[in-house]
Design a protein with these regions (language model features):
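Peripheral, non-catalytic segments that deliver or gate enzyme domains
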Residues: 1-172
Length: 172
């Protein structure tokens, strides 16, 4: 619950290894900080949530430039505007990082619910960080429930899906 009007509510700090120096402020958030998903030094997706007003906000953080810019905001209760979660892959250190396409200017988003006026139709989309537009590139058919379980190759869009129908059990 946010009771006072202030310029920011949370500050995200970092300290460099071997963790003996002073912490450095990365950015401040207007509402409550919820999560950060890292890509590289120029891309991290920062999530802010304000539960009392049912608001959800995603921004892109560029650690190299020190900038935080809003990508989109939506209502937490509006499933139709939920873009899903960024697809991740393991980097050379074995850590999950955001999978990018189009020379790092777009992010793959996986919506395993895919609320639509025709029911739940999960989808995979490409979110363009420059134009702030989302393009659905794969969607479950209406006669089944199928979602992307894993993206094996983001560049060539090789993926594994889990599929089931009223008469067929899930394929794995």
């Amino acid at each position: 619950l946010i009771k006072k009007a202030v310029p920011f509510h949370d500050a995200v700090m970092a300290i460099a290894a071997p963790f003996t120096g002073e912490p450095k402020e990365l950015f401040k958030t207007v509402t409550r900080f919820s999560n950060i998903s890292w890509g590289d030094e120029t891309l991290a997706l920062v999530t802010e949530v304000l539960r009392t007003k049912q608001r959800y906000k995603v921004s892109v953080f560029n650690a190299k430039a020190g900038s935080l810019n809003t990508l989109y905001e939506r209502s937490l209760t509006d499933a139709y505007t939920n873009l899903g979660n960024p697809v991740t892959h393991k980097n050379k250190y074995g850590k999950d990082v955001i999978a990018t396409v189009n020379n790092g200017r777009s992010v793959l988003m996986n919506n395993t619910t895919g609320a639509s006026d025709k029911g739940d139709l999960p989808y995979l989309s490409i979110y363009n960080l420059d134009t702030k537009t989302n393009e659905i590139i794969w969607r479950s058919k209406e006669d089944c429930f199928e979602y992307v379980a894993d993206v094996l190759d983001a560049t060539n869009l090789k993926m594994i899906t889990r599929r089931e129908t009223e008469k067929e059990v899930p394929n794995y």
